[in-house]
Curated annotation (Swiss-Prot):
InterPro entries: RemA-like (IPR007169)
Matching Pfam families: RemA-like (PF04025)
Organism: Thermotoga neapolitana (strain ATCC 49049 / DSM 4359 / NBRC 107923 / NS-E)
Family in the record: Belongs to the RemA family.
Lineage top rank: taxon: Bacteria
UniProt-recorded name of the protein: Putative regulatory protein CTN_0877
PANTHER family in UniProt: REGULATORY PROTEIN SSL2874-RELATED, REGULATORY PROTEIN TM_1690-RELATED
Coiled-coil ranges from the UniProt annotation: none
Length: 92
């Protein structure tokens, strides 16, 4: 029920599939990124820019974004509230 979330540079993801949006600086997340690359489950949506967030999906795919985690989370919540508002108006 979150719709599509813009993660930068015209890329969008299905909000319902997102498990976490995290900062990529910790060692465990760097290992997770490396493992996803080996398994063919890494999606790089940075367009060559610095990775500022890692998005983890329910299918164990790892998506790299050049947008800050806070910004993506804000877009996530804006989409949620917009969909909620639309659903409430439709019930009236």
């Amino acid at each position: 029920m979150y719709g599509l979330i813009n993660i930068g540079f015209g890329n969008v993801i299905a909000g319902d599939r997102v498990i976490a949006i995290v900062n990529p600086e910790s060692s465990p997340l760097k290992r997770m990124k490396d493992e996803a690359k080996i398994e063919g489950k890494l999606i790089d949506a940075t367009y060559g820019r610095k990775t500022r967030s890692i998005i983890i999906t329910d299918s164990n795919h790892i998506i790299l974004s050049a947008i800050q985690p806070e910004t993506i989370a804000q877009r996530f919540m804006e989409n949620f509230y917009e969909i909620e508002k639309t659903l409430r108006e439709g019930k009236k």
